[in-house]
Amino acid sequence: MSCGMSQLERSIDTIINVFHQYSVRVGPRDSLSQKEFKQLVQKELHNFLKKEARDEKAINDIMEDLDTNQDKQLSFEEFVILMARLVHASHEEMHKNAPHDHEGHSHGPGLGGGGPGHGHGHSHGHGHGHSH
């Protein structure tokens, strides 16, 4: 499926694949249990959620907030809410860190300051650190 896909399409595909990597381990196949969500946060989002990844209560609080139907599982739709929040926060951080005196639409490092090649529009698959 990855043949000829754009960078954005590959990114979407990656989010789906990572969700499926964790969602098939316990319980319903297409949802994350609390344990699966914790593993995903700690292994896949440890830079974006630095403090939360080390704090089980914080992970539980995030899951509770996302679990809109309160079934103690995160559906893909509920999980995507977290992805949207992280993308939004990273975008805001890029604008906050950007120098305000240059032209074009290249902004400084996103969450965590990734250095060259990690700015807005120049990602090469590297994450941006994030802490709340």
Curated annotation (Swiss-Prot):
MF term (GO), any: antioxidant activity
Q: Which intervals carry biased composition (Basic residues)?
A: 119-132
Where does the UniProt entry say this protein principally localizes? secreted
> Which cellular compartments is it found in?
Secreted; Cytoplasm; Cytoplasm, Cytoskeleton; Cell membrane
Bias regions of kind Basic and acidic residues — which residues? 92-106
Q: Respond yes or no to whether keyword Secreted is given for this record.
A: yes
Which residues are annotated with the PTM S-nitrosocysteine? C3
N-terminal signal peptide:
none
The entry's comment on post-translational modification says: Phosphorylated. Phosphorylation inhibits activation of tubulin polymerization.
Tell me the function of this protein. S100A9 is a calcium- and zinc-binding protein which plays a prominent role in the regulation of inflammatory processes and immune response. It can induce neutrophil chemotaxis, adhesion, can increase the bactericidal activity of neutrophils by promoting phagocytosis via activation of SYK, PI3K/AKT, and ERK1/2 and can induce degranulation of neutrophils by a MAPK-dependent mechanism. Predominantly found as calprotectin (S100A8/A9) which has a wide plethora of intra- and extracellular functions.
Q: How does it assemble?
A: Homodimer. Preferentially exists as a heterodimer or heterotetramer with S100A8 known as calprotectin (S100A8/A9). S100A9 interacts with ATP2A2. S100A9 interacts with AGER, and with the heterodimeric complex formed by TLR4 and LY96 in the presence of calcium and/or zinc ions. S100A9 binds quinoline-3-carboxamides in the presence of calcium and/or zinc ions. S100A9 interacts with amyloid-beta protein 40. Calprotectin (S100A8/9) interacts with CEACAM3 and tubulin filaments in a calcium-dependent manner.
Output this protein's name.
Protein S100-A9
Species, as recorded = Oryctolagus cuniculus (Rabbit)
Q: What is the lineage of its organism?
A: Eukaryota, Metazoa, Chordata, Craniata, Vertebrata
